């Protein structure tokens, strides 16, 4: 195979990996449905998306696509991959030692997914890690910032019963305390933000120039809004884990500290505004993070 053909196939595989990652992180979270349907629909969509992408990547590999070479000597020592394999392995053991391995495999006893969702997620991570061109990550994370901003605004609007997506049209009044949005419910929302906000904040903290700082700072401001208003422990857990990772890296500069102070100021500003609005405007209830801190 000629070198130009090889490069074209490699670019095709890399572009496919970028599109898949963008769909999972940036497009898929905007799916709209009622809370009662999200368990089945989201699993079906996730299963289909992962299966199609993996089959396409297998086809690219069959015609000669190769993973890009690591940019440094330590790139192959990815402890995250070992963590994913360990999690998938423990899920496999717990599934086959459960009272009903079949139900555990597909998650039929409660939230849909079970072992199959874990395995497909692990396979998707491995595929993206293997073929993604790192130069495309900035674009993916920028689009993720847009998605994060949209979901944060929808969350706040739904708190005040401003229903832009028609979620309340056929919902009983007594059920409206459960948050309906692009992610369906506050725990779905919190889990999304636990993944998205560390990335959005990291992009802002490490922006290299003023222009990038502005473009990444806008999603970071909406991320601070989400951090202030989302009533879910999953978000606090995700942010806590991200902070611990940053502390372990020990590569802070005065620029990082200044931008972290801006994020903190935005958080407390949004939290104070939300506290005032909850006290003076009828809402669906829930507790802001600042109120939980006393």
Enumerate the language-model features and the residues they cover.
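Non-cytosolic membrane-interface motifs at loop->transmembrane helix junctions
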Residues: 41-43, 104-114, 178
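Transmembrane alpha-helix boundary signature
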Residues: 58-74, 92-106, 131, 160-163
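Membrane-interfacial, low-structure loops and terminal tails that flank and connect transmembrane helices
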Residues: 1-11, 66-77
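Short, hydrophobic transmembrane alpha-helix segments
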Residues: 30-44, 65-68
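Interfacial helix-loop-helix linkers and transmembrane-helix boundary segments
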Residues: 68-76, 132-140, 254-257
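Membrane-interface helix caps and helix-loop-helix hairpins in membrane proteins
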Residues: 36, 101-108, 182, 228-232
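Alpha-helical transmembrane segments of multi-pass inner-membrane proteins
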Residues: 2, 8-31, 46-60, 83-97, ...
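Periplasmic/ER-lumenal interhelical loops and adjacent helix-loop junctions
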Residues: 274-294
């Amino acid at each position: 195979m000629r070198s130009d053909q090889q490069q074209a196939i490699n670019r095709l595989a890399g572009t496919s990996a970028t599109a898949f990652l963008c769909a999972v992180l940036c497009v898929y979270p905007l799916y709209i449905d009622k809370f009662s349907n999200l368990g089945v629909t989201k699993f079906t969509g996730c299963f289909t998306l992962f299966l199609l992408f993996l089959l396409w990547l297998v086809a690219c590999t069959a015609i000669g696509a190769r993973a890009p070479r690591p940019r440094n000597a330590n790139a192959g020592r990815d402890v995250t991959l070992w963590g994913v394999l360990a999690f998938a392995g423990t899920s496999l053991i717990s599934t086959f030692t459960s009272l009903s391995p079949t139900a555990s495999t597909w998650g039929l006893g409660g939230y849909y997914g079970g072992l199959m969702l874990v395995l497909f997620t692990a396979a998707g991570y491995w595929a993206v890690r293997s073929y993604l061109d790192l130069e495309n990550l900035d674009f993916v994370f920028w689009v993720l910032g847009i998605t994060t901003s949209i979901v944060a605004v929808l969350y706040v609007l739904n708190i005040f019963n401003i229903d832009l997506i028609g979620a309340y049209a056929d919902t009983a009044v007594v059920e409206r305390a459960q948050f309906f949005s692009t992610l369906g419910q506050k725990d779905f929302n919190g889990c999304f933000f636990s993944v998205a906000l560390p990335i959005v904040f990291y992009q802002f903290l490490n922006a290299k120039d003023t222009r990038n700082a502005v473009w990444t700072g806008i999603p970071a401001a909406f991320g601070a809004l989400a951090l202030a208003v989302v009533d879910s422990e999953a978000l606090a857990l995700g942010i806590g884990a991200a902070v611990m990772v940053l502390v372990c890296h020990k590569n802070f500069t005065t620029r990082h500290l200044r931008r972290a102070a801006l994020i903190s100021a935005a958080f407390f500003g949004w939290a104070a505004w939300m506290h005032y609005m909850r006290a003076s405007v009828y809402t669906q209830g829930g507790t802001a993070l600042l109120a939980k801190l006393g």
